[in-house]
């Protein structure tokens, strides 16, 4: 079987074939850190964290980069409003991002570069683009990329250069040769932070930062570039143009984009003022309900947000959580069940769904199906059947999607001598036919995560290596 994903550039579902067999290198556009993240910001973080987990589950080594844009007009404006340095604003909201990420159970990427740590490399990249005639210096010291010099401009977004009109996210300036030319370097303005460059003091443009950081950490050509669909144009289009102009090589092999969170007909956005913060959502509805909301629709489709929808999602999540809690009260120390045809078939359905363009709604449906069957198995006293379903929900499906996760409950000990002494006492009890106490010791060790087996060759024991710590 193979993994298929929709590539924005081709508009088609394509088989994932990494540049290096067994290794997937992916870059996910991260937040501009001038405020707390909202549900819309959280969607790509949750979706592509889960996608990375699935790739790892399928045996890939994943090298993931997610950036922080820590210098930007919005950050500067926020710093001026506070009367502090821009770095104080960025540092504050990066720290707050990590709190929200932890509360949502989002794993860190392998690298989280910050724009200001790569200014030297950005200047070097801009110099090369000027030398190759893809960029020009304006009279005021701005440096712009000339889109007409890059013949494939518009390929990612499916737009023709002659049809493009400078619009909502394109900065218009008389200094440009073409309205669609975009800034690689912005000349310093009064009250702004700046860095030295051959064209005078200034700071990086928005698009060049992601090109430089991704290529420095993943190489000139890597596998997957991901982010929200609102970034396709101009941000990702501009990234692709300047990166390929710089190296003469393909930039990202696959482009994945998630749909927007919609509220009252508009995209959830700080600029519109219709945001709902992640921390407020987790506090009101719970982590699992928030992630259930974000994963219940296919990642490429928009999701309508309202408190009524979230309330209903919370009720659905609580049904699952109550079932899991009921199981844990009934069977406090569940181990790993024996694999059988049922488990293999369910896991095959799980894999089939996620290999088909990461179809999380199908997996969510499987979780609800398993939860219903889990309740039935408990009602009928079928412990092993219940354990299979609990295990699939919490340690397979849940572990990959980052939702309803549970690990094996283990009291950790590395003290082999203590365990051996306990087993020695138990063996003496068995010789004296005091099986009742011997069995109590066995059960106590099992609850502590020590599995023992009485064989014809004596008693053997092991710590469960599948514990999710």
Curated annotation (Swiss-Prot):
Residues annotated for ATP binding in this entry: 270
Amino-acid positions noted as binding Zn(2+) in the UniProt annotation, renumbered to this chain: 29, 210, 235, 239
Catalytic activity: tRNA(Cys) + L-cysteine + ATP = L-cysteinyl-tRNA(Cys) + AMP + diphosphate
Organism: Thermosipho melanesiensis (strain DSM 12029 / CIP 104789 / BI429)
Family in the record: Belongs to the class-I aminoacyl-tRNA synthetase family.
BP terms from Gene Ontology: cysteinyl-tRNA aminoacylation
Gene Ontology molecular function, alphabetical: ATP binding; cysteine-tRNA ligase activity; zinc ion binding
A cellular component term, taken from the record's GO annotations: cytosol
Protein known as: Cysteine--tRNA ligase
Chain positions of motif 'HIGH' region: 31-41
EC identifiers of the protein: 6.1.1.16
Gene: cysS
Alphabetical UniProt keywords: Aminoacyl-tRNA synthetase, ATP-binding, Cytoplasm, Ligase, Metal-binding, Nucleotide-binding, Protein biosynthesis, Zinc
Record text on cofactor binding: Binds 1 zinc ion per subunit.
Cofactor: Zn(2+)
Keyword Methyltransferase: no
